[in-house]
Design a protein with these regions (language model features):
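Active-site HxH/HxHxD metal-binding segment of metal-dependent hydrolases
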Residues: 49-115
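Active-site-proximal loop/helix segments of hydrolase catalytic cores
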Residues: 74, 130-193
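Active-site neighborhood of phospho(di)ester-bond hydrolases with catalytic His/Asp-centered motifs
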Residues: 23-25, 57-69, 89-92, 154-158, ...
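Binuclear metal-ion centers of metallo-dependent hydrolases, dominated by the metallo-beta-lactamase
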Residues: 100-122, 166, 188-233
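Pre-active-site segment of Zn-dependent metallo-hydrolases
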Residues: 17-62, 74-78, 160-170
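Active-site-proximal beta-strand elements of phosphoester/diester hydrolases
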Residues: 4-7, 22-25, 123-129, 152-158, ...
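Active-site beta-strand termini and strand-to-loop segments that position acidic
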Residues: 15-18, 118, 146-149
């Protein structure tokens, strides 16, 4: 089984595979500069679109952590109230699950991992890391590996730049990192140990945003890409 991936802006990604849908860090209404919230047209589909919309009633909601550029409690509550979700995965969870959803919140040690067979032939592996940055060192982050017999994709979230923590992911076909991770000293080792065919940079400001922060993240991403083999990013 192969994957179809769709951006929901910023760090949000809709992951579809063999009829199973996962939404990672993808439900945000509140702005958090310089990163865009979920686009209004997608948020409308999520909350009030037809039942046949691919954004409605996803099977699993995944959250790398609960910072406001990844998680919007009010918008997530609204989504759970109007959709049938099987399970939520996160390092922690701030409220009782609603509707059909089961909240599966657990912290993992750095480099620790747990596997879940979320559908026949599809494994979700949560990998524990600290959040990057000294000021956030106490914040737990889940990196997520989604794997089938044909493809393996690793999303690092905002995990710190310690390659050995991600070893449980093994070799991957695609690696999703934010601009700061891409430009970190850890990135060449990540490429060596995971051997991705493609590195995707997500958690970027909107292209039309040209303020100082947005320009900083774009410069960092461009600088990091130049350090890796041509065509990988």
């Amino acid at each position: 089984m192969n994957f179809t991936l769709t951006s929901a802006a910023n760090a949000g990604v809709l992951i579809e595979c063999g009829g199973t849908r996962l939404l990672l860090d993808g439900i945000r209404r509140a702005p958090f500069a310089p990163f865009l919230p979920t686009p209004p047209q997608i948020l409308e589909q999520m909350l009030s679109g037809p039942e046949t919309s691919r954004w409605r009633s996803v099977d699993f909601l995944l959250f790398s952590h609960l910072h406001p550029d990844h998680f919007d409690e009010e918008a997530v509550r609204d989504y759970l109230a109007g959709n049938r979700v099987r399970e939520i995965f996160a390092p922690e969870w701030p409220f009782a699950a609603q509707g059909t959803a089961r909240a599966n919140a657990f912290a993992l040690a750095n480099g620790g991992w747990r596997d879940f067979e979320i559908a026949p032939g599809i494994i979700l592996r949560a990998i524990g890391t600290a959040h990057a940055g000294e000021q956030f060192a106490s914040v737990r982050n889940h990196a997520y590996l989604v794997a089938t017999d044909q493809a393996r994709i690793l999303f690092v979230g905002d995990g710190d730049y310690v390659p050995e923590w991600y070893l449980p992911a093994g070799h991957v076909d695609a690696l999703f990192v934010n601009p700061l991770f891409l430009n970190s000293r850890a990135m060449p080792e990540m490429v060596r140990q995971h051997a991705p065919k493609t590195v995707y940079v997500y958690h970027l400001p909107a292209a039309e945003n040209d303020d100082l922060q947005a320009r900083f993240y774009r410069r960092v991403a461009a600088r990091g890409a130049k350090k890796l083999p041509e065509g990988l990013v």
